[in-house]
């Protein structure tokens, strides 16, 4: 794997290998000293053209826990705000010796352009591009599902075959929905999208999933997890739904709907949440909720991605294992 640009680029075995590596990383993060040596001497650049809190901090934590140096670049206040192009920015990073670039961009396809235009030699990781893809979010969601739903033998080596995940809400503007449909279906899960017709994209019938319009019917189908999507009001003008109150009534997950879920069903949300709109406070804070766990797992998953791309991964040419060295001790 040279870059991570789209969840659709991952095959089943490749995805499972990343998730297994993330399990190893997660095990090391329970230690008093969490820092590991594999990326010592390498520089990871977080190149963010859109505002972000969780994703940027998560990538920064992941890189630093692998001993990489991190440069955080924000478009605001930089030469980009003065009109510098993506090409010029990339060539500047190349000249400075960036070993990996994590990019978030408002334009769909920008990370792919950066990776394949020949402007930079470093691996590129897509941290979200427009309404297109967010592959590490899909990986951390799959990691959370696999870990929480694992059988007695644990999650290592397993996929999500036979599981049913319902994804609810603003699919039209959601790169998380697209990435999860791609990855979860690759891992064998059945995925159902539930949204008002106005918040479904053109061509959704060609996606590897089912589509419905009734949240209550989807809950009654007994899914293993319900993933709520943030209503992205900043990407909307008007007319997508009659009112926020009506949206919450028809498509919001509240305590009553949570109570009808199966005994082991999970409540997920990629964050940030609009409490009281797509999810109630009771649902978000319930024992079924994995919202905080997803944030924790995001660091382990992003460590696995950086390790795989920059250190050769568990089956690559690197002679350094994730848990070796003075900072980390030995791999458990």
From Swiss-Prot:
<feature type="region of interest" description="Disordered">
    <location>
        <begin position="312"/>
        <end position="332"/>
    </location>
</feature>
<feature type="binding site">
    <location>
        <position position="272"/>
    </location>
    <ligand>
        <name>carbamoyl phosphate</name>
    </ligand>
</feature>
<dbReference type="InterPro" id="IPR006130">
    <property type="entry name" value="Asp/Orn_carbamoylTrfase"/>
</dbReference>
<dbReference type="InterPro" id="IPR002082">
    <property type="entry name" value="Asp_carbamoyltransf"/>
</dbReference>
<feature type="binding site">
    <location>
        <position position="55"/>
    </location>
    <ligand>
        <name>carbamoyl phosphate</name>
    </ligand>
</feature>
<dbReference type="InterPro" id="IPR036901">
    <property type="entry name" value="Asp/Orn_carbamoylTrfase_sf"/>
</dbReference>
<feature type="binding site">
    <location>
        <position position="175"/>
    </location>
    <ligand>
        <name>L-aspartate</name>
    </ligand>
</feature>
<comment type="function">
    <text>Catalyzes the condensation of carbamoyl phosphate and aspartate to form carbamoyl aspartate and inorganic phosphate, the committed step in the de novo pyrimidine nucleotide biosynthesis pathway.</text>
</comment>
<feature type="binding site">
    <location>
        <position position="271"/>
    </location>
    <ligand>
        <name>carbamoyl phosphate</name>
    </ligand>
</feature>
<feature type="binding site">
    <location>
        <position position="134"/>
    </location>
    <ligand>
        <name>carbamoyl phosphate</name>
    </ligand>
</feature>
<dbReference type="InterPro" id="IPR006131">
    <property type="entry name" value="Asp_carbamoyltransf_Asp/Orn-bd"/>
</dbReference>
<dbReference type="GO" id="GO:0004070">
    <property type="term" value="F:aspartate carbamoyltransferase activity"/>
</dbReference>
<dbReference type="InterPro" id="IPR006132">
    <property type="entry name" value="Asp/Orn_carbamoyltranf_P-bd"/>
</dbReference>
<comment type="pathway">
    <text>Pyrimidine metabolism; UMP biosynthesis via de novo pathway; (S)-dihydroorotate from bicarbonate: step 2/3.</text>
</comment>
<dbReference type="GO" id="GO:0044205">
    <property type="term" value="P:'de novo' UMP biosynthetic process"/>
</dbReference>
<feature type="binding site">
    <location>
        <position position="54"/>
    </location>
    <ligand>
        <name>carbamoyl phosphate</name>
    </ligand>
</feature>
<dbReference type="Pfam" id="PF00185">
    <property type="entry name" value="OTCace"/>
</dbReference>
<feature type="binding site">
    <location>
        <position position="104"/>
    </location>
    <ligand>
        <name>carbamoyl phosphate</name>
    </ligand>
</feature>
<comment type="similarity">
    <text>Belongs to the aspartate/ornithine carbamoyltransferase superfamily. ATCase family.</text>
</comment>
<dbReference type="Pfam" id="PF02729">
    <property type="entry name" value="OTCace_N"/>
</dbReference>
<feature type="binding site">
    <location>
        <position position="137"/>
    </location>
    <ligand>
        <name>carbamoyl phosphate</name>
    </ligand>
</feature>
<dbReference type="GO" id="GO:0006207">
    <property type="term" value="P:'de novo' pyrimidine nucleobase biosynthetic process"/>
</dbReference>
<protein>
    <recommendedName>
        <fullName>Aspartate carbamoyltransferase catalytic subunit</fullName>
        <ecNumber>2.1.3.2</ecNumber>
    </recommendedName>
</protein>
<keyword id="KW-0665">Pyrimidine biosynthesis</keyword>
<keyword id="KW-0808">Transferase</keyword>
<feature type="binding site">
    <location>
        <position position="82"/>
    </location>
    <ligand>
        <name>L-aspartate</name>
    </ligand>
</feature>
<dbReference type="GO" id="GO:0005829">
    <property type="term" value="C:cytosol"/>
</dbReference>
<dbReference type="GO" id="GO:0006520">
    <property type="term" value="P:amino acid metabolic process"/>
</dbReference>
<comment type="subunit">
    <text>Heterododecamer (2C3:3R2) of six catalytic PyrB chains organized as two trimers (C3), and six regulatory PyrI chains organized as three dimers (R2).</text>
</comment>
<feature type="binding site">
    <location>
        <position position="230"/>
    </location>
    <ligand>
        <name>L-aspartate</name>
    </ligand>
</feature>
<dbReference type="GO" id="GO:0016597">
    <property type="term" value="F:amino acid binding"/>
</dbReference>
């Amino acid at each position: 794997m040279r870059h991570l640009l789209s969840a659709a680029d991952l095959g089943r075995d490749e995805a499972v290998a990343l998730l297994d590596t993330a399990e190893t990383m997660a095990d090391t993060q329970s230690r008093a000293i969490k820092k590991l040596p594999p990326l010592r001497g390498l520089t990871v650049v977080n190149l963010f053209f859109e505002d972000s809190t969780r994703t940027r901090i998560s990538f920064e934590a992941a890189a630093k826990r692998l001993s990489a140096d991190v440069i955080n670049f924000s478009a605001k206040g930089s030469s980009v705000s003065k009109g510098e192009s993506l090409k010029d920015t990339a060539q500047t990073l190349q000249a400075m010796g960036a070993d990996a670039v994590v990019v978030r961009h408002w334009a769909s396809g920008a990370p792919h352009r950066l990776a394949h235009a020949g402007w930079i030699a470093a691996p590129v990781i897509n941290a979200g591009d427009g309404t297109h893809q967010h592959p590490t979010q899909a990986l951390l969601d799959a990691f959370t599902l696999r870990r929480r739903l694992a059988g007695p033998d644990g999650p290592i080596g397993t996929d999500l075959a036979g599981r049913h995940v319902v994804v609810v809400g603003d699919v039209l503007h959601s790169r998380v929905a697209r990435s999860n449909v791609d990855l979860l279906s690759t891992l064998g899960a059945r995925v159902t999208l539930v949204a008002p017709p106005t918040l479904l994209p053109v061509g959704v019938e060609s996606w590897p999933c089912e589509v419905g319009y009734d949240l209550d019917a989807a809950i009654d189908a007994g899914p293993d997890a319900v993933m709520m999507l943030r209503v992205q009001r900043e990407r909307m003008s008007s007319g997508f739904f009659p009112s926020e109150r009506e949206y919450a009534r028809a498509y919001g997950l509240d305590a009553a709907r949570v109570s009808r879920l199966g005994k082991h069903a999970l409540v997920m949300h990629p964050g940030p949440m609009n409490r009281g709109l797509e999810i109630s406070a009771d649902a978000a804070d319930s024992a079924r909720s994995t919202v905080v766990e997803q944030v924790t797992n995001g660091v382990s998953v992003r460590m696995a991605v950086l390790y795989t791309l920059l250190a050769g991964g568990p089956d690559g040419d690197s002679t350094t294992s994730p848990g070796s060295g003075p900072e980390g001790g030995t791999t458990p």
